[in-house]
């Protein structure tokens, strides 16, 4: 019987997606997130606060590796990669532990964390192996969270989806920068975008996004490619969305302003509280006007507009 190794990493909440992505890059065959907030239940209202539930500062990222992988090497590589990123984000003191699992335990363990989750008014994320019957008007995003990049329920992803729901009316061209799982591209298509171009620097993300897109019917309007932010891109867009680290976001703002059409939108997420002012100032210096600012915990998401009429935007 094949055995698997379970590697658990305890990290500050804001490091969830970063550590998950690093573990996948280091060969994990699946990633699960243990979070105290997962037990409050799924609701169909965005941004609901549950004061009776204590939000712990740390979450646990669990990665699964076949027994042919030397997890001590994975641990060392992870520590080295994290140390390179300490200037961008305080992840706290990493706690790492490993456990051996039988194959049937692996199959059950990582799947038990994932159930259908209503993310916004219209959008519900459903694991690929789950049979789910949509209600009237409900739009379903099928994801395989075992591939990489979590389930799409992280606050930065939730707020990005909410922002897309806010700005898309049908017929738009969308650029999805740092696509990861492809969830924002899939959502854009479901919300009526005519054409979506998804980019990621990571070859794993490009493959995973394509595989997730193929789980959802009618997604032929999504085009996935390797790319370094918006460098070399010449496609004009109605909406540009990016859910990546704040220190990386500021490097795409000028290209975003060049590519977004007049009256178009730039959605940025993945911004921790301490970096918000930096991102806002960079976007406004480029010529964008802030239309919507959302906050959930330590995370910020913003919708900027390229417009000459600022009467309807924040501060206008």
Curated annotation (Swiss-Prot):
It is found in: Cytoplasm. Its EC number is 2.1.1.-. It catalyses: L-lysyl-[protein] + 3 S-adenosyl-L-methionine = N(6),N(6),N(6)-trimethyl-L-lysyl-[protein] + 3 S-adenosyl-L-homocysteine + 3 H(+). One of its GO terms (biological process) is methylation. InterPro entries: Ribosomal_L11_MeTrfase_PrmA, Ribosomal_PrmA_MeTrfase, SAM-dependent_MTases_sf. It holds the Pfam family PrmA. The keyword Endoplasmic reticulum does not apply. The keyword S-adenosyl-L-methionine applies. It is an enzyme of class 2 (transferase). One of its GO terms (cellular component) is cytoplasm. Belongs to the methyltransferase superfamily. PrmA family. This is Ribosomal protein L11 methyltransferase.
């Amino acid at each position: 019987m094949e055995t698997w190794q379970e590697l658990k990493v305890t990290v500050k909440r804001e490091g969830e997606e970063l550590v998950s992505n690093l573990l996948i890059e280091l060969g994990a065959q699946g990633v699960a997130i243990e979070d105290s907030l997962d037990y409050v239940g799924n609701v169909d209202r965005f941004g609901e606060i549950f004061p009776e539930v204590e939000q712990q500062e740390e979450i646990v990222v669990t990665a699964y590796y076949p027994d042919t992988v030397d997890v001590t090497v994975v641990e060392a590589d992870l520590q080295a990669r994290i140390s390179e990123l300490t200037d961008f984000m305080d992840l706290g003191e990493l706690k790492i532990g490993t456990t051996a699992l039988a194959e049937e335990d692996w199959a059950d363990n990582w799947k038990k964390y994932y159930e259908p989750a209503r993310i916004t008014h219209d959008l519900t994320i459903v694991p690929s192996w789950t049979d789910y019957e949509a209600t009237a008007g409900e739009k379903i995003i099928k994801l395989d969270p075992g591939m990489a990049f979590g389930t799409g329920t992280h606050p930065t992803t939730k707020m990005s989806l909410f922002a897309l729901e806010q700005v898309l009316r049908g017929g738009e061209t969308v650029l999805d920068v740092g696509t990861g799982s492809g969830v924002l591209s899939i959502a854009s298509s479901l919300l009526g975008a005519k054409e979506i171009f998804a980019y990621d620097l990571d070859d794993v993300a490009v493959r995973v996004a394509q595989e997730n897109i193929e789980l959802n019917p009618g997604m032929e309007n999504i085009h996935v490619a390797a790319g370094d932010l918006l460098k070399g891109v010449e496609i004009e867009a109605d909406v540009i969305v990016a859910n990546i680290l704040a220190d990386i976001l500021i490097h795409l703002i000028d290209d975003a302003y060049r590519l977004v059409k007049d009256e178009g939108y730039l959605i940025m997420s993945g911004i921790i509280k301490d970096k918000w002012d930096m991102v806002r100032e960079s976007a406004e210096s480029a010529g964008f006007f802030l239309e919507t600012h959302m906050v959930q915990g330590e995370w910020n998401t913003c919708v900027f507009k390229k417009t000459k009429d600022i009467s309807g935007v924040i501060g206008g």
